[in-house]
Amino acid sequence: MSQFFRKGGIALNDTEWIQDFADRRLQYGVSQTKLAVMAGISREHLSRIESGKVAVTEEMKVKLLEALEKFNPEAPLTMLFDYVRIRFPTLDIGHIIKDILQLNIQYMIHEDFGHYSYTEHYYIGDIFVYTSPDEEKGVLLELKGKGCRQFESYLLAQERSWYDFLMDALVDGGVMKRLDLAINDHTGMLDIPELTEKCRNEECVSVFRSFKSYASGELVKHEEQDKAGMGYTLYIGSLKSEVYFCVYEKSYEQYIKLGIPIEEAPIKNRFEIRLKNERAYYAVRDLLTYYDAERTAFSIINRYVRFVDKEADKKRSDWKLSVRWAWFIGENREPLKLTTKPEPYTLDRTLRWIQRQVDPTLKMLETITAKTGVDYLKEIRKSTKLTEKHYKIIEQQTTSTEDVILEK
């Protein structure tokens, strides 16, 4: 694998290899810090390698190439953490924020209410930490989709990976309550209406006894984060069980939310593995044992479901895998890698709300002012006062990621 980069079929010498490697890294749009975290080395060491200040061994070439290929934008499948919920058996919320999340609590907003019967919480963006005086409840960390992406920006600045964080959480006694693994299909290898039809035709061999499907635009009767734009959706398994799958058209969601034409969407479909309690714990244990996201994800999928083609002259247990499904689970395709998509906390949702709900009224008032000279906005601003929460958000938005994180 260390001779992966070639010119005219000739293996490169070290200088050429380093240049070709650095060019490929830039082509993939990967920073040195991000790649170093994935490879398990320091950014400074990677910088010295790319500048030719230290020799690069064959072993290091393999390690760097494996790390870099995890960011290959042409990979047909990628996987992300899309939901993480962990309960810690402690009432010391400061310890969890400081030592496990490694964030500075002074930049987090405190609210005297919570969810899941917790009584208060701290949050920054979509990263929520709940607490309660009830020792049995302890402290609860919740990262939904956006929270995972935002937390990845902090992990990157901390030079930590998801594996590092999960290990820290479990060592500290963390109890997995939920884990969602999202497999993104970038090429359309999954056909959700076809999978739904196979479920109806008994071409879905599964230990699950139920499935539900919804057409594009149909109300998804479940507590989904993005239920308004999920497109064709198929649930395999009971939503009340500790493991079930949700497969939906991500391209439709991107069209509804961002206006991206369906045919141009970078992600066509998404296959989500949703795990709770003991199932979530065993998945994390497997991830931390093998550091192989594909192994963990597809061992779960293959344990619970497979799609086949009906063969009239054979028993159902002997029907062959559907070609499209076989490709999805690993036959003749590039390996799936655990990737990250760090996104800083922004005011995008607030700005979109202002644009839809507030700005038309502001524009109306400005027009009236221009025609009559009566400045309603100026009068309103005189009595407007910012709350402590507003000042905290200002602080969050004007502070660098490096200042929000804590070094262990």
Segments and roles (model prediction):
Residues S2-E16, D23, Q27, E66-Y345, ...:
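Structured, helix-rich domain cores that form ligand/interaction pockets
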Residues F21-A22, G40, H45, E58:
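Short alpha-helical segments used as structural interaction elements across diverse proteins
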